Each structure stands twice: as structure tokens, then as C-alpha cells.
Amino acid sequence: MGDYFQHWLDVGAQVTRPPKIFRVNWFRTNENGRYLWPGFGDNLRVLKWILERCDGKGKAVDTVIGGVPTLDAIDRSGLALSDTDMGRLLRVDPAEWVEAIAGQEELLHMFGDRMPKELRGEHEQLARRINAAITPPDLVGREGGE
């Protein structure tokens, strides 16, 4: 798998406009366990924002994981989706990301030296940003902080 990742990094280095990478979570649920996002054909609304973002037009707010759509960036016309639920969908909680980072670390470790250094570096940068976001500013630079 590490060789596969390296292959695509090599291909990406040869193209003039490498593809952008986006993360989505279609499966966020509310307190009753119901999906917040309607899914299916409505996923095109998110894909439209992604294409707008690639063209430099999609509105976003910077977070520790990258640009996230603003509340009004994704067309919700005709959807029964409140600002509160949309906010829940778009929320980036660094504390939740700590678990994701740990799982990613396990995956990267499985591939040992065959995991491309570029991917390890991206992972380490993300982990640092998340750690900094959950570490109170007065602890940065002290034991337990960054």
C-alpha cells in the first residue's frame, strides 16, 4: 500500500494541476441517531461547493483540518436543514480529531518504511495543528503542551 501511495505522489508531481483533496463526512448524526445530511442526490450540493472551491469561488472558513464551507456556502434550498444542524455538520472539533489521528497513526505505522515521507509529514503537521487547538495557550511550550 505504501508503494501505491508513492506511485500517486509521483504521478501528482508530474501534472501541472494536481487534484485537490477534500474530506467529507456524510454520516454525522443528531442526538436521536438520525443522519443530519439527507444524502443521495443531495450530495451533489456538496460536490458543487467542492467544484466552486477548486475555482476559487466557494466560501470557506479556515480550520485545523483545512477549509470548511461557511453556513451559507452549500445550497440548502428545499431542504429541511436548520442553521443549527448545518453548523453541526460543518463543526470541526479538534478533540474529536484526536481519536482519528490515533487511528491514522496506526495505519501509517503498519506500512513501516514503505509509507511515503510526504504522507507521514502531512499527518504529523495535522496532529500538531490539532494538538495546538486543544492545548490551552498558556500551556504551549510546557510539559503536556506543544
Regions found by a protein language model. Give the residues of each.
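Conserved NTP phosphate-binding and transfer environment spanning the P-loop NTPase/kinase superfamily
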Residues: 1-140, 144
